[in-house]
């Protein structure tokens, strides 16, 4: 008898708890059939043109039956003005920094409000490292150059894709039933950050932030792209005729306060059953473009936070909710215990190539419509762009190419040497003087970077829709966060001369009801 058969017949009373009266088998695939549906993305425009610091509104069209995943698509200016640079937004998360706040309004009632900073915090807590790297490219994580150089879009506009995180965007079972909201209009209200929050002077001190912001070109285009869901006839009829009740997540912006003392008691104003609290401390100089803070290096860091807490505790109605804990417990242990992401944000750093720029007159040449790339061991990879570098290049057509003009982008290739076809050879006179080839740089490094985002969760799994624990702050009179600061190398304590900002967010449950063609919240603040 084989060993496998011995295992099979070694069956006792204890096995009855594991394999007795089985419900599943691993050796036959089972699946469930789903209702018929189709999904299509539609563009929804905002009323008026988007301007920095202004509020714009998008009225959601009833293109289909349900409203699901929603993205804000922003087309940035394709030109830059001298001495005007985009803010770094902590590894250039420009898409989040652009949003001051964004609201869902149904029937004239604000159902939920999110903030650019909250989207950043939520990404850190819920996205794994690989997804954060992908989001980096969607949110303007690398528009060209470094934080202190101008955005270079290669002659075309840079486009930001900002995923929204409202309740109906994250769970298909919570998709917004437009078919059942016949008498209530659905709107998405977006308030953009002022230009002074988005730029800094290229050379600190040479141009004031206000002057730099005044020179910043306006956003070229902005729109929502929404995944609409078409339901089949029977399910569509049920959605239209029946009442609906959804358990949804809401965000509360609990408090924003400036700290000027090392020890503090912060009173929080919260409502509803809350499943987790999220808060941050930040040196106020990090959002002040005019600051002389050394680590600013001439640009702002709105999403860079500080670890200043020695010990902290939460008090509810004057009673300690838990024993006093060290400050790093809230941004190390709590995210590890309750979140799939973490406060270790992927920091992008560019590897410097030994010879990223190779002059054509040296190892490359243009003959007719062919670019020939010669041997250059230092460059290491295929050419990325043919550009004008350092001199004006004449063309066969009227006009000239100024320095910085991109003649052609090649993308990625299989090797550094060889010939490359030029798409517009007639534009060149045959001269090689002043032309350069930009070689693809080595892969950009992504390394974890500690970014202290503090969490306290009342739920076992706060990322899940299924409730797993809450604290009903509507039934609590006072809530206070008590802490004392500790000096950390390179980080000052809160004082009047070096104030710190404190911001608290809370995620709570509420009930969203849809009946008789109208929708609204069951519980208000």
Locate the predicted segments by residue.
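Small/polar beta-strand repeat architecture
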Residues: 353-389, 394-442
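Short, low-complexity Pro/Thr/Gly
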Residues: 1-356, 440-525
């Amino acid at each position: 008898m084989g060993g496998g058969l011995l295992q099979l017949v070694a069956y006792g009373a204890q096995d009855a708890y594991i394999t007795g009266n089985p419900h599943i088998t691993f050796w036959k695939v089972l699946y469930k059939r789903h209702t018929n549906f189709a999904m299509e993305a539609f563009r929804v425009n905002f009323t008026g043109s988007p301007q920095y610091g202004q509020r714009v509104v998008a009225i959601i069209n009833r293109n289909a039956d349900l409203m699901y995943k929603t993205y804000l698509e922003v087309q940035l200016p394709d030109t830059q003005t001298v001495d005007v640079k985009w803010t770094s937004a902590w590894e250039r998360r420009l898409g989040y920094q652009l949003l001051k706040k964004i609201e869902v309004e149904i029937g004239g009632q604000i159902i939920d409000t999110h903030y650019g900073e909250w989207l950043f915090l939520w990404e850190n807590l819920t996205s794994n490292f690989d997804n954060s790297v992908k989001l980096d490219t969607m949110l303007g994580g690398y528009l060209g150059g470094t934080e202190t150089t101008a955005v270079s879009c290669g002659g075309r506009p840079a486009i930001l894709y900002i995923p929204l995180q409202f309740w109906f965007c994250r769970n298909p079972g919570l998709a917004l039933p437009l078919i059942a909201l016949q008498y209530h209009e659905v709107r998405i209200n977006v308030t953009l950050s002022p230009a002074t929050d988005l730029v800094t002077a290229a050379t600190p001190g040479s141009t004031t932030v206000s002057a730099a912001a005044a020179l910043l070109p306006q956003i070229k285009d902005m729109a929502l792209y929404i995944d609409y869901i078409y339901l089949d006839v029977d399910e569509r009829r049920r959605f239209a005729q029946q009442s609906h009740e959804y358990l949804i997540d809401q965000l509360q912006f609990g408090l924003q306060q400036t700290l000027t003392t090392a020890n503090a008691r912060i009173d929080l104003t919260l409502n509803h059953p809350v499943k987790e609290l999220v808060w941050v401390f930040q040196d106020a100089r990090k959002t002040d473009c005019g600051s002389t803070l050394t680590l600013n290096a001439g640009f702002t860091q709105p999403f860079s936070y500080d670890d200043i807490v020695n010990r902290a505790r939460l008090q509810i109605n004057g009673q300690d909710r838990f024993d006093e804990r060290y400050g790093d417990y809230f941004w190390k242990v709590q995210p590890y215990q309750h979140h799939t992401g973490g406060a270790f944000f992927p920091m992008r750093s560019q590897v410097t190539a030994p010879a990223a720029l190779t002059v054509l007159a040296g190892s490359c040449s243009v003959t007719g419509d062919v670019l020939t790339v010669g041997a250059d061991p230092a460059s290491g990879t295929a050419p990325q762009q043919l550009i004008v570098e350092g001199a004006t290049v004449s063309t066969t057509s009227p006009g000239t190419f100024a320095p910085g003009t991109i003649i052609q982008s090649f993308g990625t290739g299989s090797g550094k040497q060889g010939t490359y076809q030029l798409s517009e050879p007639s534009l060149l006179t045959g001269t090689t003087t002043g032309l350069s080839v930009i070689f693809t740089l080595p892969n950009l490094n992504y390394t974890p970077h500690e970014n202290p985002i503090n969490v306290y969760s009342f739920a076992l799994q706060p990322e899940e829709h299924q409730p797993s624990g809450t604290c009903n702050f509507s039934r609590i009179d006072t809530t206070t966060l008590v802490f004392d600061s500790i000096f950390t190398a390179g980080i000052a304590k809160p004082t009047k001369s070096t104030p710190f900002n404190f911001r608290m967010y809370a995620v709570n449950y509420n009930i969203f009801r849809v009946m008789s063609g109208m929708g609204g919240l069951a519980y208000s603040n």
